[in-house]
Amino acid sequence: MDEEEEEEMSEREVDSQVHMACVMQGRRVGIAYYDSSMHQLFVLEIWEDITEDFPLIDLVKYQSKPSTIYTSTKTDEALLLALQRNDCNDEAPAVKLMKSSTFSYEQAWHRLMYLKVAAMDEGLSVKERICFLNSMMDLGSDVQVRAAGGLLAILDNERLLDTLDQMEGGASIAIDSVAQISLDKFLKLDATAHEALQIFQVDKHPSYMGIGRAKEGFSVFGMLNKCVTPMGKHLLRTWFLRPIIDIDVINNRLNTISFFLCCEDVMSALRGTLKSVRDIPHMLKKFNSPSSFCTSSDWHAFLKCICSLLHINKIFEVGISEHLAIKLQHMNIDLVGKANSSITEELDYVSDLVVGVIDVQRGKEKGYDTLVKDGLCEELDELRMVYEELPDFLEQVSANEIASFPFSFECRKAPLIVYVHQIGYLMCFFDEKISDALLIGLPDFEFAFSEEGEERRFYYHTQKTRELDNLLGDIYHKILDMERAIIRDLVCRVCQFIPQLTKAVNFAAELDCILSLAIVARQNNYVRPILTEDSILEIQNGRHALQEMTVDTFVPNDTKIRSSGRINIITGPNYSGKSIYIKQVALVVFLAHIGSFVPADSAIVGLTDRIFCAMGSKSMTSEQSTFMIDLHQVGTMLRHATSRSLCLLDEFGKGTLTEDGIGLLGGTISHFTDYDCPPKVLLSTHLTQIFTESYLPQSEHIKCYTMSVLNPDEQTDNEDVIFLYRLVPGQALLSFGLHCAQLAGVPSEVVQRAVTVLGDIHSKRPIRRMVWEKLAAKDQQYQDAVTKLLAFDPHKGDLVNFFQEVFPS
């Protein structure tokens, strides 16, 4: 990505502000938020259990990243706390309380009636407006209407929206589109799950002052993001934040990836063309802003973007052979048709429109800021011709003026009439100011100002310069004003095609995402998963998408979860790969739901509604201990998990007393076995006592696995072992903690002491005290004293000699 694209992406991120409104009535919560970078209004309604900590609101906040949240002054305190709460490392949004009347149904409804959407025809009646809006959002949801209308009123009052047009009956707020979202359509992952699975990883800028833009670190998103457009990156992030459970949409993405993997020349040509595609709505926003100045480079980029979009259609027409066309038809992909319907002839018209007005090379050729093409406006052409010939004209006028002076000037450089922007025409003298004596002979001279530099300059108004001011005026800014008026008219005409341009850019962004996923699938040897409505999970030789990038050899593992064996308990030593295994399974499921190929030899993935993670979050912003965070996650898991959910528990119970941990772990597993069809559970633990005691019920749902190791002595865990990283049926009763300590670089004397303590415990002997030289000398001294005391005869012995022997001076 070049510097210009990075700057555009940076500007978009800086400009991107998300403003949210939230209204609660009973258990129903209406949410609306406006994304300033996309000019879109999103609305949704959710149902929350008031006895919990509002997990769905946390999920919406995490996905939308609002900077400000507006709510009523009558909002319940529990909801306020949920709105103010921050997620992981994200900064908490500012929560502003507004008058409750702002969110009244009547005012909100009236506000929505005057909402102007980009695709809405002019002159619609109120009834027609209602029908149009109802096609984009559910106007029957009162909390949704109150949130959306209240937010529009707030944005209008605080002047946060860009376009305000006056209509009969009030102001019309213009946005590009309204979109209703439903959490039921997505695979849900909260911030904790994203952190545990390393979906995103933001690396702060290393500047000491914190100046600079953060970048994506080593993460799943960072690895799969090969997008070449800023819109593609933004859309791909949205796909990662909102994995879908619509099997038709997923299969369409997978089919398209499969097709591109069969025609790499087409894929390469498309990616090369997409590199020139920019964020046209963002560019038009800049063109339309009165505070910004558009350069020839901006218009050149705009034209190049339009041409690149049109070229996409040509690539499909030329690059897709008859054989590939049959393949597309067999895969049920209407890629060419979608491209033709998205990138329409209107873009040709827009290109011709701009080319007919803008000459991007004129400024470079003429040496000043000028954009409008010659021959478009006769008056403008005349002004520009005068301005371009002005230096020669002023030189001639200066010579005539100097010749008319009543005396001659003895100076290194002859005086000259110059044109200064916004000031006018002035007679310039170099090096020295005209003396008062000479000024007497020049009654029409009036000193204006002086300028310091390599050579001093003194400027004067004269009769001739005043005539030039009246005759020519500030000609340069006349040219700029005329050009800006022409360009403003051009922008208005181009903006009439914003819906078509946006549709084309959105198609390019989606195409960019698909190509990015195809590139990664080819580079990393991913395979196409099979999605099914059945709640099963079968993975052959699955791999961890990130871990395999960091090691020379990665050992893959299988996963098979059907109607039985849905609760997998995994034991094994530290460092044996338990956590990596359960994470890799979750990542395969996650990637399948964004429509990506997956790191495995084959995969059958049942549609999943939610991924729960209780894996010991390490967030420093949480006020709770790691164990309390795990308890909270497990509690949410037990309340909301369904047969379609995937639950990950890594070392649950280790943060408290062993007995309590075993009890909590056993109770959690028992709870899952009570389901007719439990969720898919992957659980790793070192609490192997649950197998030796009666902590677990007898159930067909439970299967035990272990990570295999090669150990010379099966009875001890202090020998050298070889980790095989292979998942096999069974249970591991040894943790090989001493070997792991050696691998971690723990000092050998500490490890040796641990061996001694463990040996005493296994032999049920008192634990021997450590032997230190000073301590051993004192022990010997005490032993000698005791020996002498036992040998001393209190009746016949010499007490003085005894004390001298025991306590020598």
UniProtKB/Swiss-Prot annotation:
Sorted UniProt keywords: ATP-binding, Chromosome, DNA-binding, Meiosis, Nucleotide-binding, Nucleus
Disruption outcome: Normal vegetative growth but severe reduction in fertility due to a decrease in chiasma frequency at metaphase I of meiosis.
InterPro entries listed in its UniProt record: DNA_mismatch_repair_MutS/MSH, DNA_mismatch_repair_MutS_C, DNA_mismatch_repair_MutS_core, DNA_mismatch_repair_MutS_sf, MutS, P-loop_NTPase
Pfam family, one: MutS_V
Tissue: Highly expressed in the panicles.
Top-level division of the source organism's lineage: Eukaryota
Keyword Nucleotidyltransferase part of the UniProt annotation: no
Residues that bind ATP: 572-579
GO molecular function, one term: ATP binding
Leader peptide range in chain numbering: none
Name of this chain's protein: DNA mismatch repair protein MSH5
Name of encoding gene: MSH5
